[in-house]
């Protein structure tokens, strides 16, 4: 945790926090035997006790300080006393369960073995080193772990690694001996992290084989206080660590007399205390190690760092009990072998002394080689100094490239110099360099500097991006630029010296050449010639060296300044760079003899950054390390070069800070003495160190520049050789081209000669050909002249023929036009005739319509008068007795009879007119058809006479039978004609019918089963048939009933079988002649409109309305196909309509009025008869009445109240059978062959009822009572010829038949009939072919009426 980036959490200043930490460390150094169990009598007395149990939890985030990913770990605020304190580590009694996984993709449990670590890692070797050092430093400070913000500031991958690497959180409890479980856990965690770091962080097999090998043994052995666990595994504390120089005097006095745990004397300033070697020896005496430990050997030489050999398994320490190898695989980096027992090894120096003092112990003969990752990342331990200068010792930074994360280091051969420059190459480079101009030299150096900067920037791309690192990058670039400028000046001066030496005026400059800083190295990696700045090498006397060392190292207080670090230095990233780039020194140069080292003594003090490249002197290993850096740069590996440049850039700021501290110390009273000591102890001045730094960079730059210039030289040589080759090729090409040109000239001469000969022969041939061509031309001209003459004659002949042909075409066109004109005139004449015909027809139609309108107006007025009278008659009927009712009935019958006579007369006159018009239109008909029509007319006249006689008899019978009926029933003729019956007792009316007359209720209602709210109406009807649907039959809707009407003795002016009475079929098809039949017609053929508004001219049938709306009088009166005679409304289309007709509930708009008929005596319906209400009708065409049903069994005129609302039921959908009145009323006997409507559909249809079969009341409901499907009775199919009129009354014998309609038919006499679902009195109904048959039917009807009256 950097002191600049993070302030103390308690709000204290840096110095106050430092004081607190030092006081806590002094308190912990006081011996407290009872706080820690003693496991051995050899435990030093100076070991401080374990901290109390209140130490924070081992996973407290404040205990860990891991840097983020990058090349430069975050600086740690070191505490000397806390770092070098050694405590007793309680060990677990069981097997060590810790095996560590760095694979963050796995969730490992405590004690699980690792199968392999192949996942990518985000933790570098530097992270683990910093974490271990931080843990060791903080273990003695119980208050240091209270900074919770620190744990949250750690990167996620560091926190995850700590959780994975410390599986002891739940396994250590308070039951463990001692009260320092947290401290013990922290020690174990630190040791595990160190072990993981030493094993390369990527090795899963055998990772825990050598981790704390004596952890399961009862007899525990610990390193000596001078060598901590971190130092045992190759770690040492920061070499430049120093205490604060501005601590107050009182604090320093309190620190006196307390020896440090590592055997060093208390670190005080020189001006406060001057102690010599005796005091230091006495203080270090009680901290002898409990057992001798072999010293860690130094790593391999720098030249072998990048390519470490395969690791050799080594035995473990003799004082520990290793675990069986069968249980755990061997470690790839085991501990070094123990030293021989007969030759005890002196105690190695501490990490501080290892970084500053010469090593007192010789390295083992066979040191184990580290992996490339460990050798490149781990700090050097106990580095032996070089003997180049007396009293000067230093360590070299490690320049090995770290191995890739997550991968095991591969076995590689020993490293050697990447490329060697022979003497010939050096001479060629020198000559080439001297031959370049000034601009070319500067360009070469600029290119080299740009390449180095580019590589350095690429290396920086993957490093940290914070502001501190950014400033560091800028400083490095500035330092590099300045160094290259200085090197260019050196190059220029060195080249000048070489040119002077080449002229023989001066000896050649020193150094290997050809550039300043060049070093010559042979193929084996040995430096054969140094650079031009290399100092003179000489041997030192061993005695003098020892004496100097003894004298220098006696004064321990001279180096007390190194124990206190300035906070400003600690808070910067530069303070740790020395550790980061330290490299272990190789064996001394071949020109020196390795001297035996004395026991560890203090080295002379060094300023910050002293243990770096700047103080290498003539060390051979350092020179080869620089060469290795250059070779790595040439291989695009700039890691080591980046470290070197960082130290060079840091050096400047370190010097500035040192100068600042020197200025602050000027006020001290012993400053002069201290300066004298430091000047005496400092082996090199700042200027010398700067010069050494320049020399170091010049060696690097020369190595790089040699390759650059050699490459340029080789390029130039290659270019020259290429140009020479091109020149030779060009010369060869020129010679070949000359030869080819000579040959071409000779060949051309030969060709020209041959060409001249050929030309002469060609001229002769052309002359001959020209003569022949002239002859051919003359012949062609003669032939063309003859051809032109022939063509002229042909053209003349063609013109003549074309003139003849054109004349013929003109004649044909004239004839065609004449023919077309005649056709057009004929067509015009026809159109004129047709137009006149249409005009005549239109005029007749208009006259007919005028007459019909006049007649309708008269009828409307008559209906109004009749309605008024009926209303008054109803009121009288309620009061009068049965006798008055009988009297009224007789009067009504007389009136109806007179009205029928008048109506027949009117109809006869109308029929005459219609027949005349039909005769005019049928002028072109065949004579045979006229004969047939005449025969049919004669036959119908005979039938009419018989019918009149029968009607007279039936009328008399009805009058006698009606006398016993108390209430008269209205004539059912109105049900088919749509007219309101006049009131009972009213006199015959001769006024014309009045349309839209309000309904007039009948004189009396049936006693039972009467349809509520309906009234019966009797009106005079025309003598032509009217459509009557069967009562109560829904499936036979819209089927007209053919009847003939007319009083006895009256005959129509024209026979009913004349063509004028031929009713139209669908789409205008006429009724074709058919054999006599009384059946109804079948439904219209497919594709025909069921609602065609067609009706025969002169037959008062209205056009058929669409089923979706209620017809109106205006539609019927002004329809283009409306009948000329008395208009008749549309037929009833369903059983619901039939029921409403029978019940008397009809509206003026539904049924067109006709002149009133004589009043017939009322008939009462049978008791118990089912009414014809809407609810009792069945079939698809049932129409529900919306009129409110009045109470049943209402008798008399009360059932026909004037206030009853009459609602015309609507048809819901078109019917599927018998939907259209394809036959006009009375068409059962009509002959239609000579009709103007054309031929119709000859398909027979089922008829209702057989002749003579009269079903009784309450027969089965299949067909309606009295209706059968056997052919021979009822209305015949449209288009079939009928010889005579037949009565339809014969086909209605039971319930559902409309007897009153029959009674008011062609016979002319008003018959009394029952309207409640059964047939009333007969009247003049039509017989099948004879009056006897019709008489039988009338008798049956009368018998049925009598039975019904008796039941009532």
Curated annotation (Swiss-Prot):
Pfam families in UniProt: NST1
Biased composition (Basic and acidic residues): 531-541, 653-664, 681-693, 726-749, 759-880
Record field: compositional bias (Low complexity): 26-45, 317-330, 368-388
Residue ranges of coiled coil: 712-943
InterPro entries: NST1
One GO term describing the cellular component: cytoplasm
The protein, known as: Stress response protein NST1
């Amino acid at each position: 945790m950097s002191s600049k980036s993070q302030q103390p959490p308690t709000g204290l200043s840096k110095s106050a926090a430092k004081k607190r930490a030092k006081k806590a460390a002094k308190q912990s150094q006081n011996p407290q035997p009872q706080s820690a169990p003693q496991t051995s009598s050899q435990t030093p007395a100076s070991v401080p006790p374990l901290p109390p149990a209140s130490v924070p939890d081992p996973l407290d985030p404040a205990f860990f300080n891991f840097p983020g990913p990058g090349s430069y770990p975050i600086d740690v605020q070191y505490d000397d006393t806390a770092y070098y304190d050694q405590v007793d580590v309680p060990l677990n009694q069981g097997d060590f369960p810790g095996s560590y996984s760095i694979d963050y993709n796995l969730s490992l449990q405590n004690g699980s073995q690792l199968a392999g670590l192949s996942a990518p890692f985000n933790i570098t070797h530097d992270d683990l080193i910093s974490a271990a050092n931080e843990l060791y430093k903080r273990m003695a400070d119980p208050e240091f772990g209270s900074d919770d913000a620190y744990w949250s500031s750690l990167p996620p991958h560091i926190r995850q690694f700590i959780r994975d690497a410390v599986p002891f959180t739940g396994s250590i409890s308070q039951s463990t001996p001692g009260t320092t479980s947290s401290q013990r856990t922290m020690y174990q965690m630190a040791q595990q992290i160190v072990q993981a770091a030493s094993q390369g962080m990527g090795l899963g097999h055998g990772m825990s084989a050598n981790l704390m090998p004596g952890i399961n043994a009862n007899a525990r052995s610990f390193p000596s206080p001078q060598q901590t666990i971190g130092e045992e595994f190759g770690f040492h504390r920061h070499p430049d660590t120093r205490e604060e120089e501005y601590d107050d005097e009182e604090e320093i006095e309190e620190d006196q007399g307390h020896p440090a745990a590592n055997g060093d004397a208390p670190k005080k300033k020189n001006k406060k205390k001057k102690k010599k070697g005796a005091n230091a020896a006495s203080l270090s005496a009680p901290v002898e190690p409990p057992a001798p430990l072999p010293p860690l050997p130094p790593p391999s030489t720098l030249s072998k760092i990048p390519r470490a050999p395969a690791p050799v398994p080594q035995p473990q320490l003799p004082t520990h009990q290793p675990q069986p190898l069968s249980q755990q695989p061997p470690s790839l980096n085991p501990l070094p072998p123990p030293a021989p027992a007969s030759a005890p090894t002196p105690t190695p120096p501490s990490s501080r002394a290892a970084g500053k003092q010469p090593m007192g112990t010789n390295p083992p003969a066979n040191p184990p080689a580290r992996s490339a990752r460990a050798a490149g990342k781990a700090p050097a331990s106990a580095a032996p100094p070089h003997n180049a200068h007396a009293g000067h010792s230093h360590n070299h930074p490690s320049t090995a490239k770290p191995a890739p994360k997550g991968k095991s280091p591969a076995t590689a051969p020993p490293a050697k110099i990447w490329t060697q420059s022979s003497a010939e190459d050096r001479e060629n480079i020198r000559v080439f360099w001297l031959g370049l101009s000034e601009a070319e030299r500067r360009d070469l150096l600029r290119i080299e500097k740009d390449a180095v900067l580019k590589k350095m920037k690429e290396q920086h791309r993957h490093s940290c991006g914070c502001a501190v690192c950014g400033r560091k990058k800028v400083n490095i670039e500035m330092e590099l630029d300045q160094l290259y400028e200085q090197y260019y000046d050196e190059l220029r001066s060195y080249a000048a010296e070489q040119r002077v030496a080449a002229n023989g005026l001066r000896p050649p400059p020193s150094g290997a050449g050809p550039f300043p800083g060049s070093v010559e190295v042979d193929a084996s990696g040995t430096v054969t010639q140094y650079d031009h700045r290399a100092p003179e090498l000489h041997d030192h006397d061993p005695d003098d060296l020892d004496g100097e060392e003894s004298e220098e190292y006696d004064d321990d207080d001279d180096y007390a300044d190194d124990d206190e670090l300035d906070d400003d230095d600690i808070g910067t990233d530069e303070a740790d760079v020395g550790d980061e780039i330290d490299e272990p020194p190789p064996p001394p140069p071949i020109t020196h003899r390795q001297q035996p080292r004395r026991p560890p003594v203090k080295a002379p003090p060094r300023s910050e950054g002293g243990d770096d490249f700047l103080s290498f002197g003539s060390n051979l290993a350092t020179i080869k390390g620089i060469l290795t850096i250059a070779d790595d740069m040439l291989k695009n590996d700039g890691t080591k070069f980046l470290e070197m440049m960082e130290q060079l850039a840091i050096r400047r700021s370190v010097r500035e800070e040192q100068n600042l501290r020197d200025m602050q110390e000027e006020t001290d009273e012993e400053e002069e003495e201290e300066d004298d000591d430091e000047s005496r102890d400092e082996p090199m001045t700042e200027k010398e160190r700067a010069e050494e730094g320049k020399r170091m960079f010049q060696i690097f730059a020369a190595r790089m520049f040699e390759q650059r210039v050699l490459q340029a030289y080789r390029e130039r040589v290659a270019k020259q050789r290429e140009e020479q080759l091109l020149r030779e090729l060009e010369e060869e090409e020129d010679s070949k081209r000359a030869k080819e040109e000579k040959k071409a000239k000779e060949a051309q001469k030969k060709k020209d000669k041959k060409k001249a000969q050929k030309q002469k022969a060609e001229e002769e041939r052309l002359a001959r050909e020209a003569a022949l061509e002239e002859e051919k031309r003359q012949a062609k001209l003669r032939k063309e002249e003859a051809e032109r003459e022939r063509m002229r004659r042909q053209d003349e002949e063609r013109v003549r023929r074309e003139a003849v042909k054109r004349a013929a075409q003109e004649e044909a066109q004239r004839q065609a036009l004449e023919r077309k004109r005649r056709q057009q005139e004929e067509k015009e004449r026809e159109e004129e005739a047709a137009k006149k015909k249409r005009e005549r027809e239109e005029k007749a139609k208009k006259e007919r319509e005028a007459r019909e309108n006049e007649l309708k107006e008269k009828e409307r007025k008559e209906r109004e008068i009749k309605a008024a009278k009926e209303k008054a008659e109803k009121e009288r009927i309620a009061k009068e007795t049965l006798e008055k009712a009988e009297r009224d009935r007789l009067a009504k019958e007389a009136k109806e009879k007179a009205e029928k006579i008048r109506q027949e007369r009117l109809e006869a006159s109308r029929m005459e007119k219609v027949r005349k018009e039909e005769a005019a239109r049928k002028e072109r008909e065949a004579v045979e058809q006229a004969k047939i029509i005449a025969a049919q007319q004669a036959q119908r006249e005979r039938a009419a006479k018989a019918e009149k006689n029968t009607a007279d008899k039936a009328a008399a019978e009805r009058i006698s039978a009606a006398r016993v009926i108390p209430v008269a029933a209205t004539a059912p003729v109105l049900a088919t004609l749509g007219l309101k019956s006049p009131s009972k007792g009213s006199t015959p009316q001769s006024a014309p019918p009045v349309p839209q007359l309000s309904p007039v209720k009948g004189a009396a209602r049936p006693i039972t089963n009467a349809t509520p709210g309906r009234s019966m109406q009797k009106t005079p009807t025309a003598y032509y048939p009217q459509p009557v649907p069967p009562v109560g039959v829904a499936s036979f809707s819209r089927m007209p009933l053919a009847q003939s009407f007319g009083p006895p003795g009256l005959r129509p002016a024209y026979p009913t079988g004349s063509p004028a009475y031929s009713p139209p079929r669908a789409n205008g098809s006429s009724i074709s002649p058919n054999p006599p039949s009384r059946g109804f017609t079948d439904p219209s053929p497919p594709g025909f409109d069921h609602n065609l508004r067609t009706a025969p001219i002169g037959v008062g049938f209205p056009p058929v309305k669409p089923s979706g709306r209620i017809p109106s009088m205006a539609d019927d009166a002004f329809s283009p196909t409306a009948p000329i005679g008395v208009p008749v409304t549309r037929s009833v289309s369903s059983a619901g309509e039939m029921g409403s007709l029978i019940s008397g509930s009809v509206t003026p708009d539904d049924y067109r009025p006709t002149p009133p008929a004589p009043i017939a005596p009322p008939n009462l319906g049978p008791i118990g008869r089912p009414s014809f209400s809407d609810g009792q009708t069945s079939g698809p065409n049932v129409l529900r009445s919306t009129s409110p049903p009045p109470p049943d069994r209402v008798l008399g005129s009360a059932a026909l109240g004037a206030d009853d609302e009459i609602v015309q039921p609507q048809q819901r959908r078109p019917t599927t059978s018998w939907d259209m009145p394809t036959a006009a009323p009375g068409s059962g006997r009509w002959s239609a062959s000579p009709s103007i409507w054309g031929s119709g559909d000859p398909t027979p249809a089922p008829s209702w009822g057989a002749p003579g079969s009269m079903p009784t009341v309450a027969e089965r409901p299949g067909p309606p009572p009295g209706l059968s499907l056997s052919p021979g009775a009822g209305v015949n199919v449209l288009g079939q010829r009928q010889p005579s009129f037949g009565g339809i009354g014969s086909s209605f014998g039971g319930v559902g038949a409309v007897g009153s309609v029959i009674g008011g038919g062609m016979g002319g006499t008003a018959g009394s009939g029952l309207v409640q679902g059964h047939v009333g009195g007969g009247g003049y109904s039509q017989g099948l072919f004879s009056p006897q048959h019709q008489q039988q039917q009338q008798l049956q009807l009368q018998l049925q009426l009598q039975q019904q009256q008796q039941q009532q």
